[in-house]
């Protein structure tokens, strides 16, 4: 998940927001409290100048949410061929088999085959569009975000192939859709063990009483 976060930060965050995810949630990825604070400070968030009261920017804090890359939809559309990049917080929940969909989409860019164009001329990408075999209508406004192996350098030494980066960021975006899932799973086993123990104890007590 930390690898996927790095791909999001260095590649995806230039266009896509995570407006429902707080920077403090990075602690769920295995970062310490100090690391979360330091990582939050690498993000620039909107702020208010305490001296003038005017809008400004400041380093992020754990209590902040991931900042948006554009101030509004007009600016977002102007920078992206009139297409507004979607927020990615819940993207894997918004698609069937969302994790695999995201990973496939990121690796599905390729020129349309001659056979496809012969049968479906409308499949040719128009100006500002890119052919992707996994996109519903085969052409989308998003340029290939993962363009070369090694585009991101992983801290753990994992080779950052396009396929690996796609898999990692898809896993990260699955986490952003439910950032407390890891903690709930970790809590689940002790709870189940306690319930099982309590059930056995209750059964044993009943047999002794009756």
Q: Across the structure, where does each feature detected by a protein language model lie?
A:
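Solvent-exposed, acidic/flexible segments
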Residues: 1, 5, 81, 95, ...
